[in-house]
Amino acid sequence: MPKMKTKSAAKKRFKITASGKVKAAAAGKRHGMIKRTNKFIRDARGTMVLAEPDGRKVVKNYLPNGL
């Protein structure tokens, strides 16, 4: 059976760290930022680490061969 292909959309959105955790950009910052708090805007600036169950799902379904 051939290898599963990596999903191109997931390749652009997620990164796997050396320890195996999955990093992604924070959500909710495309528009409507005027009503957000300054703390939210600061926190959403960088990346976040996905929760363990979500990270496992992303790797299993979308990034089977890593990056």
Swiss-Prot record:
InterPro entries: Ribosomal_bL35, Ribosomal_bL35-like, Ribosomal_bL35_CS, Ribosomal_bL35_sf. One of its GO terms (biological process) is translation. It holds the Pfam family Ribosomal_L35p. Keywords: Ribonucleoprotein, Ribosomal protein. One of its GO terms (molecular function) is structural constituent of ribosome. GO terms for cellular component: cytosolic large ribosomal subunit. The keyword Ribosomal protein applies. It comes from the Bacteria. Belongs to the bacterial ribosomal protein bL35 family. This is Large ribosomal subunit protein bL35. It comes from Rhizobium etli (strain ATCC 51251 / DSM 11541 / JCM 21823 / NBRC 15573 / CFN 42). The lineage of its organism: Bacteria, Pseudomonadati, Pseudomonadota, Alphaproteobacteria, Hyphomicrobiales.
